[in-house]
Amino acid sequence: MKFSAYLWWLFLNLALVKGTSLLSNVTLAEDSFWEHFQAYTNTKHLNQEWITSEAVNNEGSKIYGAQWRLSQGRLQGSAWDKGIAVRTGNAAAMIGHLLETPINVSETDTLVVQYEIKLDNSLTCGGAFIKLMSGFMNVEALKHYAPDTEGVELVFGPDYCAPEINGVQFAINKVDKITHESKLRYLQEMPLSKLTDTSQSHLYTLIIDESAQSFQILIDGKTVMVREHIEDKKKVNFEPPITPPLMIPDVSVAKPHDWDDRIRIPDPEAVKLSDRDERDPLMIPHPDGTEPPEWNSSIPEYILDPNAQKPSWWKELEHGEWIPPMIKNPLCTAERGCGQQIPGLINNAKYKGPGELNEIINPNYMGEWHPPEIENPLYYEEQHPLRIENVISGVILEFWSGSPNMLISNIYVGKNVTEAQIIGNKTWLMRDRAFRGSDGPTERKFMNSRLGNLQTTFHNERESPNPFDRIIDRILEQPLKFVLTAAVVLLTTSVLCCVVFT
C-alpha cells in the first residue's frame, strides 16, 4: 500500500515539474496580458500590483469589504496552481490591475478573455466577474473605483444566486449614437455557470470575433454557446438592445372608445330566476336563540375602573379630559352572564347567492388593441455591435463574494486564440489531468474554436526537444501503465538482489 502511494506521489510531482517548465516556454504577443501570479512572493507583494478600492459609501463604510490574499491552491509547489483568493464571504469584492501595454481591439481583431476559478466552499449566492476597463491611467484610479465608475467596456463571468440565477454573464458597453449615452448591454440568454462545483476548477473563456461580429463562450475548453452575426438583432437578445428598434408604438394614439376587447360576455338571452333575492344574507341568527334564565343583559359587561388614578403628569389643557380605563364588571360572573347576548348564527335557507348569468364568446370581440407603430426617431444601424470602442487599460475583478477562499488564477486578455489555448492546455488541463489521474481522449482535447477553425490541442502540440520533458510526457500520457511497469521493475529487482546475495 505504501509502495503504490509512493509511486502515485512520484507521478504527481513529475506532473508539477512538467507544469513548471511549461510556463517558461510560453511566449505572448506584446499587447497580450497573462497573470499567472508566479512573480509574487506574498500577499504584500501582490498588493503592489493588484489594487483594492478604498471607496466608501454615504455612511463612511468601505464599499468593498472583502479581503484578498495570494494563495498556493491545493497542490503545494505547483507553479500553475497559484492565484488570488477571496478571504471573505458574503461581501462585495474588488481588485484591479493596470495593463503595462494597453490593448486596442480593431475591427478585424479577435478578443479573448479567459480565467480560472476554483471554489473551496459551497456557494448559495455570488459571482466571479472580470471587467475590462478603459481610461485607467494610474493606481489612484483603482483606489477610487466604485460601482458607478465609468469606463467598463466588457463584463464576463459566472453568476449564481439560487434559485433565480445560474449562468455565465456577458455584457458589452455601447454608446448610443443619437443620445451619446453609454450603457452596458447584457446578454439575456446565459449558459449554465458550473460555479457551484467545488470538486474541481473551471476555466471560463470568451472569444469575440470582431470581423465576423460573432462570439463564443467556453467552459473547460468546451463550447457552451456560439452566436453569429450579432448585427441581426432577431437572433441575439441584449438588454438594452444594441441596435434600437426600427419601429416603435405611437404613444400619442389612445384606444378607441368603441373597441371591444372582451373575450367573453354574459349571455343576453339568459333569464334570471324570479325567486332569487340577492339581499338575503348567507348567515342568520338562530331563531331559537333566547337568553338563559340567569343571564342579565341590563348589567354592562365592562365598567370604568373605580380604583384608577389620574397620572400626575396629566394636564387636561394639553391631553384633554382624563378617562379611567375599562375593566371587566365584577358583577358579571361566568355563572350568570351579562351584557348583550348574541345568539348563534346558522345558514340561511333562503340564500341562493348572486344571480350569475351564463357567459358566451363575445361575437363582437375585436382582439387585443395595440397602438399603431411609427418609425423610431432615435433609430440607427449599429454596424459593429461587438466592437470594443475604447482602448483597454485595466482589468478588474468585481463581484459579490458568496464563497470564501475562492481561487482565481491564469487571467488572460489578448487578441490571439492560440495563446489562450496553449495557456489553458499547459495550466488548467495539466492540473485537471493530475487531479483525475487519467488521460483519455476527452481530457486531451481542450479548445476547438469555430471562430477561425483553430484546433490546437494539448495532444497535437509540438513535442519538446528536451529528452527529460519527452519522458515525462510519456509518463503523463499513460500514468497507470507507468505505475504498473515501475512496480514490476522494482519487484523484479528486489527478487534478483535477494537471490544474488543469498
Swiss-Prot record:
Presence of the UniProt keyword Transmembrane helix in the record: yes
Region named 4 X approximate repeats: 250-316, 320-377
Coiled coil: none
Positions bearing carbohydrate: 25, 104, 296, 416, 425
Subcellular location(s) per record: Endoplasmic reticulum membrane
GO molecular function, one term: carbohydrate binding
Signal peptide: 1-19
Lumenal side: 20-481
GO cellular component, one term: endoplasmic reticulum membrane
GO biological process, one term: protein folding
Membrane topology category: Single-pass type I membrane protein
This protein's record includes keyword Cell division: no
Family label: Belongs to the calreticulin family.
Further remark: In contrast with other calnexin, yeast CNE1 does not seem to bind calcium.
Annotated function: Interacts with newly synthesized monoglucosylated glycoproteins in the endoplasmic reticulum. It may act in assisting protein assembly and/or in the retention within the ER of unassembled protein subunits. It seems to play a major role in the quality control apparatus of the ER by the retention of incorrectly folded proteins.
Protein name: Calnexin homolog
Source organism: Saccharomyces cerevisiae (strain ATCC 204508 / S288c)
Gene that encodes it: CNE1
